[in-house]
Amino acid sequence: MEHASTREIYSVQATVRTYESGADGLMKPETVLHWFQEIAEAHASCLGFGYDFVTSRSLAWVEVRLDASVNRLPRWKETVELRTWMAQETPLLARRNLEIRDAQGNCIVAASCLWAVIDIRRRRPVPLNRHISFFPDTPCKETVAPVSMDISGLLPSIREWTAERRDTDFNRHINNAAYLVWALDSLPDSWLENHQLTGIHLHFRKETHAGDSMKSLLFLRDSLTSHHLMHGDELRAEAVLEWKTAEIA
């Protein structure tokens, strides 16, 4: 990734690699989340409160929710621009907006997410201004609205698995991108082959660790799928995915 930034808007040029692409030649949906995590940390470091800053104070940035709109996913070998900007939203939350733009400047993926800083020992959020004296004054309103799905009257399909060590990140819990992978893995191949992902809505509620037994409750209604990602009876994360019928090549 090639970086170019101001303190207000941080931008990166990046090219989609082979291992970031699926069988259809498009970027894997979870790679979008990995890219967003990478540029978010780079921008936070540029502003003076990135990974090194928070870990030196026994703190960590954690993502609370993410809402993304997908016009299309970048193609293998396509070079795109990632853009991000942020601002404090509440005493405990910062909002970060992100975009992926193609070579013509078209926004092909947009996202709006909320982040908190937690005390690593207590695993509890702390007021942002306790440790961070400066936030950009860049306007950072919600650009992608959350989407909910009425699951009343629907019976779920259930899938079970064990959270794996390879999905653990620096914060010693399962990385947020894994929840999207789990949600997608719960869908039948026939659905994935005939539908195109147009929206990703993730609400992260509790940490998950390697070795945790997990299950997915999948609900389908029209162009939405709802995924309750559970550990026993405890909801760890909820995903609502938006779809449209795939175009015939």
Regions found by a protein language model. Name each.
Residues 2-63, 110-112, 118-198:
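Hot-dog-fold acyl-thioester-processing enzymes
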Residues 78-79, 155-157, 212-213:
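Short coil-to-beta-strand transition motifs
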Residues 161-245:
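Acidic/His-leaning functional-site neighborhoods
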Residues 2-12, 67-150, 208-210, 219-249:
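HotDog/MaoC-like acyl-thioester-processing domains
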Residues 58-73, 195-207:
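Small beta-barrel nucleic-acid-binding modules, principally OB-folds
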